[in-house]
Amino acid sequence: GLIEKYLRSGKIKINKKKIKSSIKVKTNDIINFFNFDFKETIVQKKIKFEPSKEIIKSNEDQIIDNNENFIVLNKSSGISVQGGTKSKKNLVDIFAKSEIFQGTKPYSVHRLDKDTSGVFIMAKTRESAQLLTSLFRLRKVHKTYLAICHGELNKDSGEWNDDLIRYDGEKKIIEKAKTLYKVLDKNSEASLIELKPITGRKHQLRKQLYAVGQPIFGDVKYKLSNSFKGINKNLMLHSYQIRFIANNIKHTYTALLPDYFKKLLKTKRLRFLD
């Protein structure tokens, strides 16, 4: 522990002598503290993920396009884009070991929640990463999501303009969030909704659907008390299509719906005409 560490480094001494933690303190012993910080600092280390050949292959099989500048894949639900202190399995570490990125490394150029499936782009070079990142930041990338949510929306189409709250430590931050929506099919139990986020706030679509009382199926974070009945473990939010222009070339990428998404559409008697 921390005391053990300070004993080894000599920040804690007995009678001005370095001692081991096994030594017992006697009466009249003097405990010395040198450059001692009584505040324990917790350092969170990023977890390194070592993917198996099977995991690498299964993710390579999800690739929609592979060109000299970037790859596009249909990301599975339950896998993070980048590693972190909480997440282990992630796309950056997986593709770093792939032959596709031999001689280079994968660059993550945009966000996609761990539990959200669908279109995701990874750059192959620093130059491509800078270009694509700037396109996302300048809102030049047009994104379309599909979601299955509880109940019916009052209007079949429209836009949401919300002030979303997030916290940076104890600091409260309010961010403007704008999304265009269109109901593709609905009944009293569920709705299939097309979502086009104009801004890119964290958990934007999930928060906005929760705010109108129609949370997404499978969302355990933004849910009404009676809305989550364990029908499906997966979050029913899918990044369906991405469109952008890069170097005067138009790019459009569409990701097929996961089987569990199609299964819930059928269960809820919702139709999707792709």
Language model region names:
Residues 1-274:
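RNA pseudouridine synthases
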